[in-house]
């Protein structure tokens, strides 16, 4: 469906206006279903880490938009598929996790969704389902007889996730090869148990989603639809959700609300309007006003983006604390208890530690070499004073109010605290 096409349903109108839609199967049928009643839709998330990161946020926001439009979201946790590992976009096999690791990861991920969705027993309340419930019950022969007949190896070999591995002569295990069948069965099971008619996901999941749509229509002759979002990258082409210091996690245990706020504050100028549409609930007319701010005033829009995104993920208080800490640190030069802290053994600081090493250890630079280049370019500060020599030794003599304040560029600060 073209970008100019007009939808009748509030749900698809919102997705289109805010830039979420990449591809849709059966768009007219889906639009009619969403305009005529409650649509139940799901997105699957494998439990490969104890949190999700910003790279998954567009999918979380899709479920939020679905619920805001009066429909029912299903968060499908891949307790079963995580045991296999999604080969999509991977050059090598994932490390297999134990059942205990998967359960712990699911518990961490549940905390994320509670901030974005309303869960409960109502007709449009979100529910969380684990595909291990049905996948673990299948006998191998039964699974092949019931579902293997609907998939040809010819077609499976044509999927990008498989084809790219083979072209690069990189091994793919038979375990991974089965992933697409398992994901297709997820849709069928959710359709039967919960009346789910729509699977959503990133555009890299298009093939897997098509499998589920076609399996559900072929086996049970039920309505089934698929919808994908564009793969998200910054204006400069960087992968969304990754920084020099690592992944931008959505759980406070993995990344502080302050660092989360700073991630959004550091958004490139060209991305501000797009990210406000995708990652905040601000009205479109207000977003249009913010993205039109001239010159340096665009920084005000970035602060609004950071405020709104952090409020959604961490709550109003944490968003306010993060902004206050940033303003104190960068605009007033003051210390704040809400700034990120890196703890170091008091004996190690007393003996002295090379600044480049400290920068890398504290997450202000990806490596010692990066820290040295940053210092040479004037981007390193110790206690608010520029330090061009990354080889200089930091000791307890540098303590101010019990900490050493390190800054990388204009927007990243860590307080080094001896313990």
Swiss-Prot record:
Record PROSITE patterns: S4
Organism superkingdom: Bacteria
EC number per UniProt: 6.1.1.1
InterPro entries linked: aa-tRNA-synth_Ic, Rossmann-like_a/b/a_fold, S4_RNA-bd_sf, SYY-like_C, Tyr-tRNA-ligase, Tyr-tRNA-ligase_bac-type, Tyr-tRNA-ligase_bac_1
GO biological process, one term: tyrosyl-tRNA aminoacylation
Annotated positions binding L-tyrosine: 42, 179, 183
Pfam families: SYY_C-terminal (PF22421), tRNA-synt_1b (PF00579)
Gene3D superfamilies in the cross-refs: HUPs, RNA-binding S4 domain, Tyrosyl-Transfer RNA Synthetase
Motif placement: 'HIGH' region: 47-56
SUPFAM superfamilies named among the record's database cross-references: Alpha-L RNA-binding motif (SSF55174), Nucleotidylyl transferase (SSF52374)
The entry's keywords: Aminoacyl-tRNA synthetase, ATP-binding, Cytoplasm, Ligase, Nucleotide-binding, Protein biosynthesis, RNA-binding
Enzyme class: ligase
Localisation: Cytoplasm
GO terms for MF: ATP binding; RNA binding; tyrosine-tRNA ligase activity
GO cellular component: a single term: cytosol
Reactions this protein catalyses: tRNA(Tyr) + L-tyrosine + ATP = L-tyrosyl-tRNA(Tyr) + AMP + diphosphate + H(+)
Chain ranges of the S4 RNA-binding domain: 353-418
Binding site residues for ATP: 242
Function: Catalyzes the attachment of tyrosine to tRNA(Tyr) in a two-step reaction: tyrosine is first activated by ATP to form Tyr-AMP and then transferred to the acceptor end of tRNA(Tyr).
Family stated for the protein in its record: Belongs to the class-I aminoacyl-tRNA synthetase family. TyrS type 1 subfamily.
Name used for this protein in its record: Tyrosine--tRNA ligase
Organism encoding this protein: Caulobacter sp. (strain K31)
Organism lineage: Bacteria, Pseudomonadati, Pseudomonadota, Alphaproteobacteria, Caulobacterales
């Amino acid at each position: 469906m073209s970008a100019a096409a007009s939808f009748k349903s509030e749900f698809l109108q919102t997705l289109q206006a805010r830039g979420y839609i990449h591809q849709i199967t059966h768009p007219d049928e889906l639009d009619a279903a969403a305009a005529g009643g409650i649509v139940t839709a799901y997105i699957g998330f494998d439990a490969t880490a104890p949190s999700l990161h910003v790279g998954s946020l567009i999918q979380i926001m899709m479920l939020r938009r679905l619920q805001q439009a009066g429909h029912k979201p299903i968060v499908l946790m891949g307790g079963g598929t995580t045991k296999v590992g999604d080969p999509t976009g991977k050059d090598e096999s994932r490390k297999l996790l134990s059942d205990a690791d998967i359960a712990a990861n699911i518990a961490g991920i549940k905390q994320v969704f509670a901030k974005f969705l309303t869960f409960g027993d109502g007709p449009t309340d979100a529910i969380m389902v684990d595909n291990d419930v049905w996948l673990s019950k299948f006998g191998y022969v039964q699974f092949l007889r019931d579902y293997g007949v609907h998939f040809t190896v010819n077609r499976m070999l044509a999927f990008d996730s498989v084809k790219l591995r083979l072209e690069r002569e990189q091994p793919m295990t038979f375990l991974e090869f089965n992933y697409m069948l398992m994901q297709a069965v997820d849709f069928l099971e959710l359709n039967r148990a919960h009346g789910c008619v729509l699977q959503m996901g990133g555009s890299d999941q298009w093939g897997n989603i098509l499998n589920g749509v076609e399996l559900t229509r072929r086996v049970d002759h039920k309505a089934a639809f698929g919808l994908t979002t564009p793969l998200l990258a910054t204006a400069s082409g960087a992968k969304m959700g990754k920084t020099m210091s690592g992944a931008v996690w959505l759980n406070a245990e993995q990344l502080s609300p302050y660092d989360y706020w700073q991630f959004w504050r550091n958004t490139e100028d060209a991305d501000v309007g797009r990210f406000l549409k995708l990652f905040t609930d601000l009205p479109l007319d207000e977003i249009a006003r913010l993205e039109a701010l001239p010159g340096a005033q665009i920084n005000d829009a970035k602060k609004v983006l950071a405020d709104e995104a952090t409020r959604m993920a961490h709550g109003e208080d944490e968003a306010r604390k993060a902004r206050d800490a940033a303003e104190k640190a960068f605009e007033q030069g003051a210390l704040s208890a809400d700034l990120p802290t890196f703890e170091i053994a008091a004996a190690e600081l007393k003996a002295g530690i090379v600044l480049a090493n400290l920068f890398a250890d504290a997450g202000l630079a990806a490596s010692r070499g990066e820290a040295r280049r940053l210092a040479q370019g004037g981007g390193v500060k110790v206690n608010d004073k520029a330090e061009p020599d990354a080889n200089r030794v930091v000791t307890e003599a540098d303590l101010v109010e019990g900490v050493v304040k390190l800054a990388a560029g204009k927007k990243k600060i860590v307080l080094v605290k001896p313990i």
